[in-house]
């Protein structure tokens, strides 16, 4: 990723994965981009074909993992193919930490 990402002053990046991301939030969308795990949210940035940024905030939402799918509230994010980053570490960090 070559662009600057703006995070909140009290937000810390725990892990990042770049790859093919499948997002279901009522509609199925597939993007190639960066998936950031912070202490406050999952943040997706895609600059290929279309510029897209999407945040899934943890506050007040149930979060879980089901068959390698990250669940935040009613939203499901699946990493279908990881180009870079440690996906296993990312999944473990997501499931082990309570924010």
Indicate where each model-derived feature is located.
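Phosphoinositide-dependent membrane-docking surfaces
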Residues: 41-44, 52-69
């Amino acid at each position: 990723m070559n662009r600057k990402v703006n995070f909140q002053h009290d937000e810390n990046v725990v892990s990042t994965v770049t790859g093919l991301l499948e997002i279901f939030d009522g509609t199925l969308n597939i993007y190639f981009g960066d998936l950031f795990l912070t202490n406050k949210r999952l943040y997706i940035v895609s600059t290929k074909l279309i510029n897209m940024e999407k945040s899934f905030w943890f506050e007040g939402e149930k979060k879980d993992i089901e068959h390698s799918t990250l669940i935040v509230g009613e939203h499901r994010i699946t990493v279908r193919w990881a180009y870079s980053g440690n996906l296993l570490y990312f999944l473990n960090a997501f499931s082990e930490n309570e924010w």
